[in-house]
Amino acid sequence: MSAGIYLHIPFCKSRCSYCDFATDVFKNEETVERYVSALIKEIENFESEARALSNVRASAAVDTIYFGGGTPSLLAPQQLEKILNSIYKKFSLMENIELTMEMNPATVTSETLKSYKSLGVNRASFGAQTFDDSELKRLGRRHSASDVRETIELLRGAGFDNVSFDLIAGLPRQTLKDWERNLDEALKLNPEHLSLYLLEIHEGTPLAEQIRSHRQPLPDEDLAGEMYELITRKTCRKGYEQYEISNFSLPGYASKHNSKYWLCEPVYAFGVSAHSFDGNARYANERDTAKYVSLIESNDSAEVFREETNLASEFIFLGLRLSKGIDLIEYENRFGINIKEKYAEDLQRLEELGLIEFAENRLKLTRKGMVYSNEVFTVFV
């Protein structure tokens, strides 16, 4: 079984109103350089860390690397090169790895992108979120719709032929027509991959407070469902395949790295708040950037959480996110559990509600089930 590597770069030019990730507003180059040094040290100390290595963690060859954030495209090419060199020295890498970097529009130049490409980055993922400038402003995004279009031109000019957009539906005050315009604008740019999410509200964010005080009204559940139906209809017409609840790709361009999470494959994660999975247990690093750096510099482990997983349960609710669903025979052979027998009453209820279906020894969500997936997942959590 192959593994992925995730590296968290927490710095952003500013914090978006809906963001619940571990991020820090970019202050100065010295802070970033110190963080990069800590990140490299954590990678170098990987095998000697307190998180006890299983055979999977020690032996799996790596076929994906993913820089997430935050805004990884704030890294200078020299910093990226140092991080990658530490990975190449430490891990066994397979050929033709997928190397993704998240980017924000208007944070990159043609020269920077060409440098990233020369260092092996072969997939770019960036958060367009919306093509409506007023919506971008309400979300606290620093870029404009024209910045997104310009960034795509820069990426293509630098030789990137695997580009992914993030878009968010169900934004405050957004109508179905607004969302359709956003989707049409994205499809005009012909990205190889689209991640299309319904807005999630996280407590403690400015947006959550604005919604609570009725300053930012949200679309109702029925409208959100219509927005999702529009996604599946329009992307299909343009040749995209829906391979996961929120992810659509042209043939051959599904995200290999993100698929590891849904298939319960190992991911070694480094950096502040990074979450790892070794095939048996999940690990999480310190969420505060300053504390993370201090721990690493003091030769301590940044790990603050470790938990053995109920893999039999996770395999179901994560696997159901995929359009192909779960192979029932493969599942029974792996875990010794007959899903139809163990969850008979719940499955009957969900099937009667039109949320799941059985087809050729597979259990999968229906189109309606993808809209109301949380109702299905709670059965297996």
Give the residues covered by each predicted segment.
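Short active-site neighborhood of thiol/selenol oxidoreductases, capturing the structured segment around
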Residues: 5-8
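Short, amphipathic alpha-helical interaction segments positioned at domain boundaries
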Residues: 368-381
